[in-house]
Amino acid sequence: AASDVYKRQDLISTKDTFREILKKSKTSELNLYGFASDQSPRKNKANYWGVFLNNYVPIHTGAETIAKKYNMAVVFMDVQKIKRGYYEASFITITEEPKKYKDYEITERFIELLEKQIINKPEYYTWTHKRFKHRKTLST
């Protein structure tokens, strides 16, 4: 039942992500996975560097990798603050066919949407988070 959805939430550690998704992909259950994207990968583990808010930074690509491996849709959640304690989320489909995209194209689209969200409401962005831990400023 829809009311049971809150009882079936699981947090999956990074190291267990692939194993858990593989296990759940073998069932007939419908699953939704959300990825926190506010951290910077370790500098020596960064597979991809891209431009984010005029800084050249390492970017996690796990969501794109998993989407391609398991052929899962990728959706961006745009969250807007309505008033204190009230938020509204809308969902923007990036792709329903991730295997048709070149490497990092989905990640780049996600970054574009995130930048747009931040530029529209910069006061709600946590500027102190670790996204810029390993950055290189772009020259103009």
Regions found by a protein language model. Give the residues of each.
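Non-catalytic C-terminal accessory region of glycerolipid acyltransferases
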Residues: K15-T140
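Short, small-residue-biased leader/transition segments that mark boundaries at the very start
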Residues: A1-Y6
